[in-house]
């Protein structure tokens, strides 16, 4: 896909500032992933600086991984400001379906904010969509490609957004068309925060292209970087460091050689 390679170059030329309201577990790895890729991360959630920070950011990433009574209002306020300013907003509903608080928080943000991309695994996306009566329930352990395609399409339509259902194959849809991305490696599941990092990388690409292509670009680049990392470091600790290295090293030529992306009309 030509646009993935071009977006990578454009991202590095523009060095977008990506504001993350994310969880404690992944702040460091997310920031390092963005820096390695060529974006600028900022982790800012204080209520008193949100207006200033959102106004200068190129995109906002909201990740609900470690919710509490202080962070939720900050997430909601930031999403409202970003919507008013028409900034790209990427929502990662970490653990939606596991508790009522997580599901309710994700749904509230989806209901009032103009979310550009909703990125989660099958169970998380099914959970928020299930609350709207569109799915049979949450089952992230066992699903087939047709179910993932339908889920991505239905979530995009229901929430008027781009839905990225990530797994062994990533499915990204705007409700009208869908991309299947087969890049990545199972070792990603052995390192905490890799899904969260991919969400923030989508945020960086959202600063240089429309949501559908931004999501495809981010997931493709991250997936290729993971494949290359595993070829050099097949164990979790060194693999994580090598992912940073390949986010830094990946270029247009490697994207053209390694991208496994297919587009389907719905």
Curated annotation (Swiss-Prot):
<feature type="binding site">
    <location>
        <position position="166"/>
    </location>
    <ligand>
        <name>ATP</name>
    </ligand>
</feature>
<dbReference type="GO" id="GO:0009229">
    <property type="term" value="P:thiamine diphosphate biosynthetic process"/>
</dbReference>
<feature type="binding site">
    <location>
        <position position="43"/>
    </location>
    <ligand>
        <name>substrate</name>
    </ligand>
</feature>
<keyword id="KW-0784">Thiamine biosynthesis</keyword>
<keyword id="KW-0460">Magnesium</keyword>
<feature type="binding site">
    <location>
        <position position="119"/>
    </location>
    <ligand>
        <name>ATP</name>
    </ligand>
</feature>
<protein>
    <recommendedName>
        <fullName>Hydroxyethylthiazole kinase</fullName>
        <ecNumber>2.7.1.50</ecNumber>
    </recommendedName>
</protein>
<comment type="similarity">
    <text>Belongs to the Thz kinase family.</text>
</comment>
<feature type="binding site">
    <location>
        <position position="193"/>
    </location>
    <ligand>
        <name>substrate</name>
    </ligand>
</feature>
<dbReference type="GO" id="GO:0005524">
    <property type="term" value="F:ATP binding"/>
</dbReference>
<dbReference type="GO" id="GO:0004417">
    <property type="term" value="F:hydroxyethylthiazole kinase activity"/>
</dbReference>
<keyword id="KW-0418">Kinase</keyword>
<keyword id="KW-0808">Transferase</keyword>
<comment type="pathway">
    <text>Cofactor biosynthesis; thiamine diphosphate biosynthesis; 4-methyl-5-(2-phosphoethyl)-thiazole from 5-(2-hydroxyethyl)-4-methylthiazole: step 1/1.</text>
</comment>
<keyword id="KW-0479">Metal-binding</keyword>
<keyword id="KW-0067">ATP-binding</keyword>
<dbReference type="InterPro" id="IPR029056">
    <property type="entry name" value="Ribokinase-like"/>
</dbReference>
<dbReference type="GO" id="GO:0000287">
    <property type="term" value="F:magnesium ion binding"/>
</dbReference>
<dbReference type="GO" id="GO:0009228">
    <property type="term" value="P:thiamine biosynthetic process"/>
</dbReference>
<keyword id="KW-0547">Nucleotide-binding</keyword>
<dbReference type="InterPro" id="IPR000417">
    <property type="entry name" value="Hyethyz_kinase"/>
</dbReference>
<dbReference type="Pfam" id="PF02110">
    <property type="entry name" value="HK"/>
</dbReference>
<comment type="function">
    <text>Catalyzes the phosphorylation of the hydroxyl group of 4-methyl-5-beta-hydroxyethylthiazole (THZ).</text>
</comment>
């Amino acid at each position: 896909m030509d646009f993935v390679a071009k977006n990578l170059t454009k991202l590095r030329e523009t060095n977008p500032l990506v504001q993350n309201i994310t969880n404690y577990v992944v702040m460091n790895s997310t920031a390092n992933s963005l820096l390695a890729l060529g974006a600028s991360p900022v982790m800012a959630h204080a209520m008193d600086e949100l207006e200033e920070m959102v106004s200068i950011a190129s995109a906002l990433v909201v990740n609900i991984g470690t919710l509490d009574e202080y962070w939720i209002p900050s997430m909601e306020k930031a999403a409202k400001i970003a919507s008013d300013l028409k900034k790209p907003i990427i929502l990662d509903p970490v653990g939606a379906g596991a508790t009522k608080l997580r599901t309710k928080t994700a749904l509230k943000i989806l209901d009032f904010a103009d979310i550009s991309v909703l990125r989660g695994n099958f169970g998380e996306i099914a959970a928020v969509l299930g609350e709207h009566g569109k799915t049979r329930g949450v089952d992230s352990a066992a699903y087939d490609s047709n179910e993932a395609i339908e889920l991505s399409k239905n979530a995009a339509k229901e929430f008027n957004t781009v839905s990225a259902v990530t797994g062994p194959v990533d499915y990204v849809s705007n409700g009208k068309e869908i991309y299947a991305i087969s890049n990545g490696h199972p070792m990603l599941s052995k390192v905490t925060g890799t899904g969260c990092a991919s969400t923030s990388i989508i945020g960086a690409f959202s600063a240089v292209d429309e949501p559908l292509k931004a999501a495809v670009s981010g997931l493709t680049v991250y997936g290729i970087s993971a494949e290359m990392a595993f070829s050099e470091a097949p164990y979790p600790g060194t693999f994580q460091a090598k992912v940073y290295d390949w986010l830094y090293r990946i270029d247009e030529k490697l994207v053209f050689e390694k991208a496994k992306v297919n587009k389907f009309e719905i």
